[in-house]
């Protein structure tokens, strides 16, 4: 069940910190951008168990505008580090906040009449 899985995740996190404490450690939570506010709820559950250092936000190539990016930062204080814009491994990109904001407010130009 969910509680057992979360306990296992916490155990893995503790063991890694104990065994290789001197190594840099990054724990990224992968969230689906199309789930909206539910992504925040999911992240809160993971934050109770593991030391999450950032987020990978997938499915930003679809209809989702990714407004959850702002909520992730504001409500949880987590940076979005990577985004997925397709289905392949080469479709992951570093998250660039400036480009993201530009894309949110981008409008398609109306066709010019001849």
What residues fall within each predicted segment?
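P-loop/Walker A NTP-binding module and the surrounding RecA-like catalytic core of P-loop NTPases
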Residues: 1-114
